[in-house]
């Protein structure tokens, strides 16, 4: 089996697998019964110790504040992302802006301690590796697993890919590849080393937190991905939420209550979070039961409290018919995404051989029914191992048995002065891809160039008719000296979604030996420092009170701050000396925009006025002192 494993890092459950003579899905005693192959993607804190998996999930009812679920929905996200703000109330644990970053980052909290989403994902990965090594040991293998192929949603943006890469490193894994989940499922279904049978698959991967659709052509061990689309906020979690909202409405109807959400918000904190935790557990149970039973009961041990503080028991029956009615709009949304991916590809529907269903949510009967109604019934197939297909495909790739062609999942854009939606890398390009572009400085003496990267969500725009531009990160270029307006900077942007995130290099076009200091920031402390530099420059420009020498000095210091900030991270770790240097230079720059500077300018102006108007009235000694003060103030202000 070796030292490499295939991992499906899921929203609700995660799976690890190996490939040797056959594909072997890892089992563990503390995994979810009955087959013990699913590891709950849940992390909890219990008496100061981290727990992962089923034991962590079992803590959700009694201590939901210290149980992290669905971290995959938060990884690589910013606190100010509109969808994050919309979804905050669904999480029982604390989520804030990162204390060491910008609004383009976020943190979760356990036991009063701040964690990055990558830290939580790393704990899940560590657990999977631990289970895999135990599983290997039972077969006589003693390899230390230190490499992995980790799967991600095909529609993940660059920032989410990068965050998954960081999580893998924090788990002690050398990441062989980030593999799109639908492609992994296609490999699991179609891999046959010596076959020359060509099949084109539309993979419908409906999981706990995301919906992905990809078109993949398979022949033998070769797989060509031609298009992909998805919704990163559509999955089993949303089925659960629909059930919870129904329960609230039913309790309100039964008890004659007007606004249940307001009542819940007014409950004592501990009772409120316990109630919400129990509702989540009960909704998930009901969802599973309704796949095989006509109805399910939702009962919580923690009651609701009405306006008078009286206990209102929660006991609601939901029928399969009602459940199907609730989730039908979500399923119809997923069908539209299938048609989107067909539109993005070169394949008409009649040239698609198989519509392959994988993922936990695809096992809900009404989901399968709606897909069979939307597409030719003879094309729709459920994967033989729908819950493990993605991990199996990752294991086959980890064994080095495939050849693949993949494409860019979505447009990569830069916000420019003359083009706020400049596409630097278009969706559908074959990976890896390298693009070149010339940018010109906008002003004489400009030392800094700021690029803002984002990725538009075309699928959501098609479905909701709203722009959903997902911010990826920022890049500041610091020139080595002032240059005239129109100076051309040649920028090279590289993307290989399998192994690396977005990379960017820059040099002066006419002086290629002059490399421009640059670093791509994704919400960390380097971005916060660079953001403050930009703010200080704006303040100085607004004040318009610097001499030409002062402007040059301010620009020079700003450039030094950026250069130091661009070196803060090395191998994704903070370099304390570079951080200190950047912070010191930032303080120096802040002095140019400070209140003390305005006071110094006031005294400089007053002293010069006194020397000019009252020259003959001032004692020579006093005059000399004033002249010295004016000189000192001039030097300080410059």
Predicted features, each with a name:
Residues 1-86, 96-102, 114, 123, ...:
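Oxyanion-binding/catalytic loops of NTP- or PPi-dependent enzymes
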Residues 89:
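Active-site metal-coordination/substrate-binding segment of hydrolases
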Residues 110:
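Juxtamembrane segments of multi-pass membrane glycosylation machinery
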Residues 116-118:
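Hydrophobic alpha-helical hairpins/lids featuring a short glycine-rich hinge
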């Amino acid at each position: 089996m070796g030292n490499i494993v295939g991992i499906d890092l899921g929203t609700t459950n995660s799976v690890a697998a190996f490939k040797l003579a056959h594909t072997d899905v890892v089992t563990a005693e503390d995994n979810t019964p009955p087959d013990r192959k699913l590891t709950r993607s849940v992390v909890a804190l219990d008496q100061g110790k981290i727990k992962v998996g089923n034991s962590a999930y079992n803590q959700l009812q009694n201590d939901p504040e210290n149980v992290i679920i669905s971290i995959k929905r938060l990884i690589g996200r910013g606190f100010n992302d509109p969808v994050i703000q919309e979804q905050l109330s669904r999480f029982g644990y604390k989520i804030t802006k990162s204390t060491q970053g910008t609004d383009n980052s976020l943190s979760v909290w356990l036991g009063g301690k701040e964690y990055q989403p990558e830290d939580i994902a790393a704990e899940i990965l560590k657990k999977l590796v631990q289970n895999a090594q135990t599983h290997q040991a039972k077969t006589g293998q003693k390899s230390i697993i230190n490499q992995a192929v980790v799967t991600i949603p095909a529609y993940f943006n660059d920032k989410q890919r990068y965050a998954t890469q960081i999580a893998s490193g924090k788990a002690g894994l050398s990441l062989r590849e980030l593999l799109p989940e639908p492609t992994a499922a296609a490999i699991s279904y179609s891999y046959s080393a010596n076959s020359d049978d060509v099949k084109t698959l539309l993979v419908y991967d409906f999981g706990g937190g995301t919906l992905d659709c990809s078109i993949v052509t398979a022949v033998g061990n070769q797989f060509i991905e031609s298009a992909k689309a998805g919704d990163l906020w559509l999955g089993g979690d949303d089925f659960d939420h629909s059930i919870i909202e129904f329960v609230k409405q039913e309790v309100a109807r039964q008890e004659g209550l007007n606004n249940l959400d307001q009542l819940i918000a007014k409950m004592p904190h501990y009772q409120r979070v316990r109630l919400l935790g129990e509702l989540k557990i009960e909704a998930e149970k009901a969802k599973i039961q309704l796949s095989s039973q006509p109805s399910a009961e939702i009962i919580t041990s923690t009651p609701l409290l009405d306006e008078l503080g009286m206990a209102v028991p929660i006991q609601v029956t939901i029928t399969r018919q009602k459940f199907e009615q609730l989730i039908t709009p979500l399923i119809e949304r997923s069908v539209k995404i299938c048609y989107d991916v067909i539109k993005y590809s070169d394949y008409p529907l009649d040239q698609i051989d198989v519509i392959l269903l994988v993922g936990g949510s695809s096992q809900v009967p009404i989901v399968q029914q709606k897909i069979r109604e939307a597409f030719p019934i003879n094309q729709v197939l459920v994967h033989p191992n729908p819950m493990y297909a993605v991990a199996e495909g990752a294991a086959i790739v980890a064994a080095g048995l495939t050849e693949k062609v993949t494409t860019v999942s979505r447009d990569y854009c830069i916000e420019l002065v003359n083009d706020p939606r400049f596409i630097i890398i278009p969706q559908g390009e074959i990976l890896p891809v390298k693009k070149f572009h010339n940018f010109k400085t906008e002003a004489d003496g400009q030392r800094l160039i700021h690029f803002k990267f984002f990725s538009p969500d075309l699928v959501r725009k098609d479905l909701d008719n709203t722009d959903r531009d997902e911010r990826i990160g920022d890049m500041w270029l610091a020139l080595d000296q002032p240059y005239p307006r129109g100076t051309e900077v040649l920028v090279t942007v590289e993307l290989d979604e399998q192994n690396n995130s977005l990379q960017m290099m820059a040099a002066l076009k006419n002086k290629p030996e002059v490399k421009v200091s640059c670093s791509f920031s994704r919400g960390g402390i380097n971005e916060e420092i660079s953001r403050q530099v930009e703010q200080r420059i704006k303040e100085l420009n607004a004040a318009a009170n610097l001499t030409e020498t002062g402007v040059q000095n301010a620009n020079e210091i700003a450039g030094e701050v950026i250069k130091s900030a661009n070196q803060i991270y090395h191998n994704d770790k903070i370099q304390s000396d570079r951080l200190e240097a950047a912070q010191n230079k930032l303080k120096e720059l802040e002095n140019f925009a400070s209140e003390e500077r305005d006071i110094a300018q006031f005294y400089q102006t007053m002293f010069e006025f006194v020397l000019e108007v009252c020259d003959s009235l001032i004692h020579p000694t006093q005059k000399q002192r004033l002249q010295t003060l004016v000189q000192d103030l001039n030097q300080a202000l410059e």
